[in-house]
């Protein structure tokens, strides 16, 4: 997303827990969104943000903890840019919206076909709580929103166990090592 926005002439401000150098980012902010006070201090550098793309989550031991931590991260981001002239916010979640949380995978029957208008599944699901915070902030501050629920993300973050590119690379390496076709 950052690459494309930059190509289209946008000023891109990136955010992550660590201080990284991203070639497509005009400015990078290192902030731990699980810490409200630290987030607010760090996000003062994004007081001019007009569009937000929220694409992060933090895996916790239980879904109840996922709900608490991940909804707080969305809230802390928006509270940290409370004075920014935000026009639109895009939240990226995923397939667990339709299939249930990790704790409930294969325990509840999903509604099929998957439709954006389908009711939420029973049980805790941090995606739902992230959406609720987004909806609350959008209504209070007057910006538009969108939610994107891709099945698979292919990225480049080292150490991300949910990175499909890493999964395919490991599988290809095993196939090569064992002499099996890929």
What do the PLM-derived regions correspond to, one by one?
Residues 1-10:
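N-terminal Rossmann NAD(P)H-binding glycine-rich loop of SDR-like oxidoreductase domains
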Residues 13:
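Conserved beta-strand positions in the Rossmann-like core of class I SAM-dependent methyltransferases
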Residues 170-182:
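A conserved pocket-lining segment of Rossmann-fold NAD(P)-dependent short-chain dehydrogenase/reductase
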Residues 133-162:
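Conserved beta-loop-beta element that borders a ligand/cofactor-binding pocket
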Residues 51-53, 65-66, 72-126:
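Conserved Rossmann-fold NAD(P)-dependent oxidoreductase catalytic core, especially the SDR/UDP-sugar
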Residues 34, 97, 153-155:
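Conserved sequence/active-site signature of Rossmann-fold short-chain dehydrogenase/reductase
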Residues 20-80:
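NAD(P)H-binding glycine-rich loop region in Rossmannoid oxidoreductase-like domains
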């Amino acid at each position: 997303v950052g690459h494309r926005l930059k190509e289209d002439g946008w000023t891109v401000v990136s955010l992550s827990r660590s201080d990284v150098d991203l070639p497509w980012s005009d400015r990078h902010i290192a902030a731990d969104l699980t810490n409200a006070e630290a987030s607010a201090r760090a996000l003062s550098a994004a007081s001019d943000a007009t569009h937000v793309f929220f694409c992060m989550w933090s895996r916790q031991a239980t879904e109840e903890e996922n709900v608490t931590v991940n909804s707080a991260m969305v809230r802390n981001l928006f509270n940290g840019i409370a004075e920014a002239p935000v026009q639109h916010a895009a939240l990226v979640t995923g397939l667990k919206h339709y299939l249930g949380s990790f704790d409930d995978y294969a325990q509840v029957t999903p509604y099929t076909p998957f439709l954006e208008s389908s009711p939420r599944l029973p049980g805790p699901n941090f995606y739902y709580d992230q959406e609720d915070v987004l909806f609350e902030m959008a209504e209070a501050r007057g910006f538009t929103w969108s939610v994107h629920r891709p099945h698979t993300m292919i990225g480049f973050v080292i150490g991300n166990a949910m990175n499909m590119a890493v999964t395919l690379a490991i599988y290809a390496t095993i196939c090569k090592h064992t002499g099996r076709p890929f």
